[in-house]
Amino acid sequence: MADWKGPRYDAGWLYRRIKWGTWDELGLYDNIESASINRSAFDTLKTSGSLKYFGTAPDEVDALALIYTFRDRNGETVEQRRATVLVESDEPDYTSLDGGGVRQSGSAKIYSLLKVLSDTKLKVPYTVAAGANAIAAANKIITGAGLRTNCQSSGYLLSCDHTFAPDNSLLDVVNYLLDAAGYGSADTDAYGAVILRPYVEPTARELAWTFANDETSTLMPGISSENDWRNTPNIIVLTYETDDETYVAQARNIDPESRASLPSRSWRENSTVEQVSELDGDTQDERLENLKALARKKLLDGSSEIQYTKVKTLLVPVEINDAAGVLYSGIKRQGAITSIDTSCTPTAETNIKIREFIRRDLLVDVTGQVIAV
Protein backbone atom coordinates (compact mmCIF):
# COMPACT_ATOMS: atom_id res chain seq x y z
CA MET A 1 0.00 0.00 0.00
CA ALA A 2 1.30 3.43 -0.94
CA ASP A 3 2.56 5.62 1.91
CA TRP A 4 0.98 9.07 1.49
CA LYS A 5 2.08 10.33 4.92
CA GLY A 6 5.85 9.97 4.56
CA PRO A 7 8.38 11.74 2.33
CA ARG A 8 7.83 11.68 -1.43
CA TYR A 9 10.60 11.36 -3.98
CA ASP A 10 10.67 12.09 -7.73
CA ALA A 11 7.17 13.55 -7.50
CA GLY A 12 5.54 14.94 -10.62
CA TRP A 13 2.69 14.66 -13.09
CA LEU A 14 2.01 12.61 -16.21
CA TYR A 15 -0.41 13.76 -18.90
CA ARG A 16 -1.72 10.88 -20.98
CA ARG A 17 -3.92 10.93 -24.05
CA ILE A 18 -7.00 8.68 -23.75
CA LYS A 19 -8.71 7.47 -26.93
CA TRP A 20 -12.33 8.60 -27.10
CA GLY A 21 -14.81 5.73 -27.20
CA THR A 22 -12.36 2.88 -26.57
CA TRP A 23 -10.73 4.64 -23.58
CA ASP A 24 -7.40 3.06 -24.43
CA GLU A 25 -4.31 4.74 -22.98
CA LEU A 26 -2.23 6.31 -25.74
CA GLY A 27 1.05 8.19 -25.50
CA LEU A 28 2.09 10.83 -23.00
CA TYR A 29 2.00 14.54 -23.73
CA ASP A 30 5.46 15.97 -23.04
CA ASN A 31 4.54 19.57 -23.87
CA ILE A 32 2.18 20.42 -20.99
CA GLU A 33 4.04 22.84 -18.73
CA SER A 34 1.54 23.29 -15.90
CA ALA A 35 -2.03 22.50 -14.93
CA SER A 36 -4.58 22.83 -12.16
CA ILE A 37 -7.58 20.69 -11.21
CA ASN A 38 -10.62 22.15 -9.47
CA ARG A 39 -13.15 19.73 -8.01
CA SER A 40 -16.39 21.08 -6.55
CA ALA A 41 -19.39 19.19 -5.21
CA PHE A 42 -21.55 22.21 -6.04
CA ASP A 43 -20.49 22.63 -9.66
CA THR A 44 -22.68 20.89 -12.24
CA LEU A 45 -19.66 19.46 -14.07
CA LYS A 46 -17.85 18.70 -10.78
CA THR A 47 -14.41 19.04 -12.42
CA SER A 48 -12.77 21.97 -14.20
CA GLY A 49 -9.33 23.51 -14.44
CA SER A 50 -6.71 24.79 -16.83
CA LEU A 51 -3.36 23.96 -18.38
CA LYS A 52 -0.54 25.60 -20.29
CA TYR A 53 1.33 23.98 -23.15
CA PHE A 54 3.92 24.69 -25.81
CA GLY A 55 3.89 23.41 -29.37
CA THR A 56 0.72 21.67 -30.55
CA ALA A 57 -2.34 21.89 -28.32
CA PRO A 58 -3.69 18.68 -26.75
CA ASP A 59 -6.33 16.90 -28.83
CA GLU A 60 -9.90 18.13 -28.23
CA VAL A 61 -11.70 14.92 -29.26
CA ASP A 62 -9.74 12.46 -27.17
CA ALA A 63 -9.65 12.79 -23.39
CA LEU A 64 -6.73 13.71 -21.16
CA ALA A 65 -5.71 11.86 -17.99
CA LEU A 66 -3.86 13.78 -15.27
CA ILE A 67 -1.76 11.40 -13.18
CA TYR A 68 0.15 12.21 -9.98
CA THR A 69 3.25 10.10 -9.41
CA PHE A 70 5.89 9.77 -6.70
CA ARG A 71 8.12 7.23 -4.98
CA ASP A 72 7.39 6.68 -1.28
CA ARG A 73 9.90 5.96 1.49
CA ASN A 74 9.42 2.22 0.98
CA GLY A 75 10.53 2.51 -2.64
CA GLU A 76 7.05 1.92 -4.07
CA THR A 77 6.21 3.98 -7.15
CA VAL A 78 2.75 5.48 -6.96
CA GLU A 79 0.75 6.53 -10.02
CA GLN A 80 -2.69 7.84 -9.14
CA ARG A 81 -4.96 9.15 -11.85
CA ARG A 82 -6.66 12.26 -10.46
CA ALA A 83 -8.96 13.15 -13.36
CA THR A 84 -9.91 12.28 -16.92
CA VAL A 85 -11.05 15.40 -18.73
CA LEU A 86 -11.87 17.09 -22.01
CA VAL A 87 -9.69 19.93 -23.29
CA GLU A 88 -10.73 23.19 -24.97
CA SER A 89 -7.75 25.26 -26.12
CA ASP A 90 -7.61 29.01 -26.58
CA GLU A 91 -6.02 30.43 -29.71
CA PRO A 92 -2.23 29.92 -29.52
CA ASP A 93 0.41 32.58 -28.98
CA TYR A 94 3.51 32.87 -31.18
CA THR A 95 6.85 34.15 -29.88
CA SER A 96 9.90 34.92 -31.99
CA LEU A 97 13.02 33.08 -30.90
CA ASP A 98 16.57 34.42 -30.89
CA GLY A 99 18.30 33.26 -34.01
CA GLY A 100 15.03 32.84 -35.90
CA GLY A 101 12.05 30.60 -35.62
CA VAL A 102 8.78 30.85 -33.71
CA ARG A 103 7.63 29.22 -30.48
CA GLN A 104 3.95 28.32 -30.28
CA SER A 105 2.31 28.12 -26.87
CA GLY A 106 -1.11 28.49 -25.35
CA SER A 107 -3.54 27.74 -22.57
CA ALA A 108 -6.60 25.54 -22.36
CA LYS A 109 -9.55 24.90 -20.11
CA ILE A 110 -10.35 21.40 -18.90
CA TYR A 111 -13.74 19.94 -18.01
CA SER A 112 -15.10 16.64 -16.76
CA LEU A 113 -16.65 14.26 -19.28
CA LEU A 114 -20.06 15.37 -17.97
CA LYS A 115 -19.63 18.22 -20.46
CA VAL A 116 -20.66 15.74 -23.15
CA LEU A 117 -24.07 15.53 -21.44
CA SER A 118 -24.35 19.22 -20.54
CA ASP A 119 -23.55 20.35 -24.10
CA THR A 120 -26.09 18.02 -25.73
CA LYS A 121 -29.56 19.61 -25.88
CA LEU A 122 -32.71 17.56 -26.37
CA LYS A 123 -33.88 19.63 -29.37
CA VAL A 124 -37.41 18.19 -29.07
CA PRO A 125 -39.64 17.60 -26.00
CA TYR A 126 -38.63 14.44 -24.16
CA THR A 127 -40.89 12.51 -21.79
CA VAL A 128 -39.85 9.99 -19.17
CA ALA A 129 -42.95 7.88 -18.57
CA ALA A 130 -44.50 6.92 -15.25
CA GLY A 131 -43.35 3.47 -14.18
CA ALA A 132 -39.88 3.89 -15.68
CA ASN A 133 -36.93 2.80 -13.58
CA ALA A 134 -35.22 6.14 -12.90
CA ILE A 135 -31.66 4.84 -12.60
CA ALA A 136 -31.94 2.47 -15.57
CA ALA A 137 -33.24 5.40 -17.65
CA ALA A 138 -30.36 7.64 -16.53
CA ASN A 139 -27.83 4.90 -17.26
CA LYS A 140 -29.24 4.43 -20.77
CA ILE A 141 -28.97 8.15 -21.53
CA ILE A 142 -25.35 8.28 -20.37
CA THR A 143 -24.18 5.19 -22.24
CA GLY A 144 -26.12 6.34 -25.30
CA ALA A 145 -23.93 9.46 -25.31
CA GLY A 146 -20.80 7.30 -25.50
CA LEU A 147 -19.79 7.45 -21.85
CA ARG A 148 -19.19 4.67 -19.36
CA THR A 149 -20.95 4.38 -16.01
CA ASN A 150 -20.21 3.11 -12.54
CA CYS A 151 -23.82 2.42 -11.65
CA GLN A 152 -25.48 1.10 -8.51
CA SER A 153 -28.89 -0.27 -9.53
CA SER A 154 -32.18 0.80 -7.95
CA GLY A 155 -35.76 -0.43 -7.99
CA TYR A 156 -37.25 3.07 -7.83
CA LEU A 157 -40.00 3.69 -10.43
CA LEU A 158 -41.28 7.13 -11.42
CA SER A 159 -44.84 7.77 -10.21
CA CYS A 160 -45.80 10.14 -13.03
CA ASP A 161 -44.73 11.30 -16.48
CA HIS A 162 -42.18 14.10 -16.69
CA THR A 163 -41.55 16.07 -19.88
CA PHE A 164 -38.40 18.08 -20.54
CA ALA A 165 -38.23 21.11 -22.83
CA PRO A 166 -36.09 21.08 -26.00
CA ASP A 167 -33.50 23.41 -24.44
CA ASN A 168 -32.87 21.06 -21.52
CA SER A 169 -29.62 19.10 -21.68
CA LEU A 170 -29.04 15.39 -21.25
CA LEU A 171 -27.37 16.22 -17.94
CA ASP A 172 -30.56 18.00 -16.79
CA VAL A 173 -32.53 14.82 -17.46
CA VAL A 174 -29.96 12.57 -15.79
CA ASN A 175 -29.76 14.69 -12.64
CA TYR A 176 -33.57 14.87 -12.41
CA LEU A 177 -33.77 11.08 -12.54
CA LEU A 178 -30.99 10.70 -9.97
CA ASP A 179 -32.66 13.14 -7.60
CA ALA A 180 -36.03 11.41 -7.97
CA ALA A 181 -34.43 8.11 -6.94
CA GLY A 182 -32.59 9.60 -3.96
CA TYR A 183 -29.19 9.50 -5.67
CA GLY A 184 -26.51 12.18 -5.60
CA SER A 185 -26.04 14.32 -8.70
CA ALA A 186 -23.85 12.89 -11.46
CA ASP A 187 -20.09 12.91 -11.01
CA THR A 188 -17.21 11.16 -12.75
CA ASP A 189 -14.51 9.00 -11.25
CA ALA A 190 -10.83 9.52 -11.99
CA TYR A 191 -11.16 7.39 -15.15
CA GLY A 192 -14.10 9.36 -16.56
CA ALA A 193 -16.89 6.89 -15.80
CA VAL A 194 -20.11 8.56 -14.62
CA ILE A 195 -20.90 7.63 -11.01
CA LEU A 196 -24.53 6.79 -10.19
CA ARG A 197 -24.97 5.99 -6.50
CA PRO A 198 -27.42 6.76 -3.69
CA TYR A 199 -26.90 9.89 -1.64
CA VAL A 200 -25.50 9.15 1.81
CA GLU A 201 -25.53 11.65 4.67
CA PRO A 202 -21.98 12.82 5.54
CA THR A 203 -22.38 11.59 9.12
CA ALA A 204 -23.07 8.07 7.78
CA ARG A 205 -19.96 7.94 5.58
CA GLU A 206 -16.77 6.19 6.59
CA LEU A 207 -13.96 8.64 7.35
CA ALA A 208 -11.61 8.75 4.34
CA TRP A 209 -8.84 10.90 5.86
CA THR A 210 -7.96 12.85 8.99
CA PHE A 211 -5.85 15.99 8.58
CA ALA A 212 -3.81 16.17 11.79
CA ASN A 213 -0.77 18.24 12.73
CA ASP A 214 1.20 15.29 14.07
CA GLU A 215 4.30 13.40 12.94
CA THR A 216 2.41 12.05 9.89
CA SER A 217 0.97 15.42 8.90
CA THR A 218 0.53 16.40 5.26
CA LEU A 219 -0.74 19.83 6.28
CA MET A 220 0.85 23.14 5.41
CA PRO A 221 0.73 25.92 8.03
CA GLY A 222 -2.60 27.36 9.10
CA ILE A 223 -6.26 26.47 8.69
CA SER A 224 -9.27 28.77 8.46
CA SER A 225 -12.99 28.41 9.08
CA GLU A 226 -16.29 30.17 8.45
CA ASN A 227 -19.90 29.69 9.55
CA ASP A 228 -22.71 30.47 7.11
CA TRP A 229 -25.64 30.46 9.57
CA ARG A 230 -26.97 33.86 8.44
CA ASN A 231 -27.79 32.43 5.02
CA THR A 232 -29.74 29.42 6.27
CA PRO A 233 -33.50 29.52 5.55
CA ASN A 234 -36.00 29.92 8.37
CA ILE A 235 -39.04 29.24 6.15
CA ILE A 236 -39.45 26.41 3.64
CA VAL A 237 -42.46 26.34 1.29
CA LEU A 238 -43.09 23.26 -0.88
CA THR A 239 -45.69 22.97 -3.63
CA TYR A 240 -46.94 19.97 -5.59
CA GLU A 241 -49.29 20.37 -8.55
CA THR A 242 -51.67 18.00 -10.31
CA ASP A 243 -54.21 18.73 -13.02
CA ASP A 244 -56.91 19.24 -10.37
CA GLU A 245 -55.24 20.68 -7.29
CA THR A 246 -52.18 22.30 -5.78
CA TYR A 247 -50.69 21.16 -2.48
CA VAL A 248 -48.81 23.69 -0.34
CA ALA A 249 -46.81 22.98 2.82
CA GLN A 250 -44.91 25.51 4.91
CA ALA A 251 -42.39 24.85 7.67
CA ARG A 252 -41.14 27.69 9.91
CA ASN A 253 -38.21 27.75 12.32
CA ILE A 254 -39.72 29.28 15.49
CA ASP A 255 -37.08 28.05 17.94
CA PRO A 256 -35.87 30.98 20.12
CA GLU A 257 -32.60 29.10 20.80
CA SER A 258 -31.71 29.06 17.07
CA ARG A 259 -29.70 32.01 15.76
CA ALA A 260 -31.43 31.71 12.37
CA SER A 261 -35.03 31.40 13.64
CA LEU A 262 -37.84 33.88 13.06
CA PRO A 263 -37.95 34.93 16.76
CA SER A 264 -34.18 35.55 16.73
CA ARG A 265 -34.00 37.29 13.36
CA SER A 266 -37.18 39.37 13.70
CA TRP A 267 -37.99 40.83 10.28
CA ARG A 268 -35.04 39.06 8.62
CA GLU A 269 -37.07 36.36 6.91
CA ASN A 270 -35.09 33.99 4.72
CA SER A 271 -37.51 31.82 2.78
CA THR A 272 -37.09 29.14 0.13
CA VAL A 273 -39.87 28.02 -2.22
CA GLU A 274 -39.52 24.72 -4.09
CA GLN A 275 -41.77 22.71 -6.39
CA VAL A 276 -41.88 18.96 -5.76
CA SER A 277 -42.19 16.72 -8.82
CA GLU A 278 -42.82 13.40 -7.02
CA LEU A 279 -45.19 12.90 -4.06
CA ASP A 280 -46.36 9.59 -2.60
CA GLY A 281 -49.83 9.01 -1.14
CA ASP A 282 -53.07 7.31 -2.19
CA THR A 283 -55.39 9.97 -0.78
CA GLN A 284 -55.39 13.74 -0.62
CA ASP A 285 -54.74 13.69 3.13
CA GLU A 286 -51.82 11.27 2.76
CA ARG A 287 -50.24 13.40 0.04
CA LEU A 288 -50.61 16.57 2.11
CA GLU A 289 -49.13 14.94 5.21
CA ASN A 290 -46.21 13.61 3.17
CA LEU A 291 -45.57 17.08 1.74
CA LYS A 292 -45.68 18.61 5.23
CA ALA A 293 -43.23 15.99 6.50
CA LEU A 294 -40.92 16.73 3.58
CA ALA A 295 -41.11 20.48 4.29
CA ARG A 296 -40.20 19.85 7.92
CA LYS A 297 -37.25 17.65 6.93
CA LYS A 298 -35.97 20.21 4.42
CA LEU A 299 -36.22 22.99 7.00
CA LEU A 300 -34.35 20.95 9.60
CA ASP A 301 -31.68 20.04 7.06
CA GLY A 302 -31.46 23.59 5.73
CA SER A 303 -31.48 25.23 9.17
CA SER A 304 -28.42 23.36 10.30
CA GLU A 305 -25.47 25.67 10.81
CA ILE A 306 -22.82 25.07 8.19
CA GLN A 307 -19.24 25.18 9.42
CA TYR A 308 -16.55 25.30 6.73
CA THR A 309 -12.97 24.37 7.50
CA LYS A 310 -10.26 25.10 4.93
CA VAL A 311 -6.95 23.25 4.95
CA LYS A 312 -3.86 23.48 2.76
CA THR A 313 -2.11 20.16 2.30
CA LEU A 314 -0.01 17.97 0.07
CA LEU A 315 -2.22 15.99 -2.29
CA VAL A 316 -3.79 12.98 -0.55
CA PRO A 317 -6.14 10.28 -1.93
CA VAL A 318 -9.51 11.87 -1.17
CA GLU A 319 -12.41 12.98 -3.37
CA ILE A 320 -15.26 15.46 -3.10
CA ASN A 321 -18.09 14.14 -0.91
CA ASP A 322 -15.67 11.98 1.07
CA ALA A 323 -15.92 12.29 4.85
CA ALA A 324 -12.83 13.90 6.39
CA GLY A 325 -11.70 15.01 9.83
CA VAL A 326 -9.44 17.80 11.10
CA LEU A 327 -7.36 17.60 14.30
CA TYR A 328 -5.33 20.78 14.59
CA SER A 329 -4.06 22.38 17.81
CA GLY A 330 -7.15 21.53 19.82
CA ILE A 331 -9.58 22.03 16.93
CA LYS A 332 -11.64 18.94 16.09
CA ARG A 333 -13.91 18.96 13.03
CA GLN A 334 -15.53 16.33 10.83
CA GLY A 335 -17.58 16.77 7.67
CA ALA A 336 -17.79 16.21 3.92
CA ILE A 337 -15.25 17.51 1.42
CA THR A 338 -16.91 20.03 -0.89
CA SER A 339 -13.94 21.24 -2.94
CA ILE A 340 -10.41 20.14 -3.84
CA ASP A 341 -8.19 22.58 -5.75
CA THR A 342 -4.88 21.06 -6.81
CA SER A 343 -1.86 22.65 -8.45
CA CYS A 344 -0.17 20.11 -10.71
CA THR A 345 3.35 20.73 -9.41
CA PRO A 346 5.76 18.28 -7.73
CA THR A 347 4.48 19.35 -4.29
CA ALA A 348 0.88 19.06 -5.56
CA GLU A 349 -0.24 21.80 -3.16
CA THR A 350 -3.95 21.32 -2.55
CA ASN A 351 -6.63 23.46 -0.92
CA ILE A 352 -9.48 21.45 0.57
CA LYS A 353 -12.76 22.72 1.96
CA ILE A 354 -14.70 20.59 4.45
CA ARG A 355 -18.34 21.28 5.29
CA GLU A 356 -19.84 20.24 8.61
CA PHE A 357 -23.55 20.41 9.39
CA ILE A 358 -24.18 21.39 12.99
CA ARG A 359 -27.65 19.99 13.59
CA ARG A 360 -29.82 20.85 16.56
CA ASP A 361 -33.33 19.85 17.57
CA LEU A 362 -35.50 22.80 16.52
CA LEU A 363 -38.98 23.95 17.36
CA VAL A 364 -40.74 23.92 13.98
CA ASP A 365 -44.24 25.02 12.97
CA VAL A 366 -45.68 23.16 9.95
CA THR A 367 -48.89 24.02 8.07
CA GLY A 368 -50.43 22.85 4.80
CA GLN A 369 -53.38 23.24 2.50
CA VAL A 370 -54.86 21.93 -0.73
CA ILE A 371 -56.01 24.47 -3.30
CA ALA A 372 -58.46 23.40 -5.99
CA VAL A 373 -57.52 24.48 -9.50
Ranges and model annotations:
Residues 37-56, 102-115, 238, 301-312, ...:
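Oligomerization/assembly interface segments of phage tail-like spikes and tubes
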Residues 2, 55-149:
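Surface-exposed cap/loop segments at beta↔alpha junctions
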Residues 22-70, 116-117, 121, 128-132, ...:
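Extracellular/virion structural assembly segments
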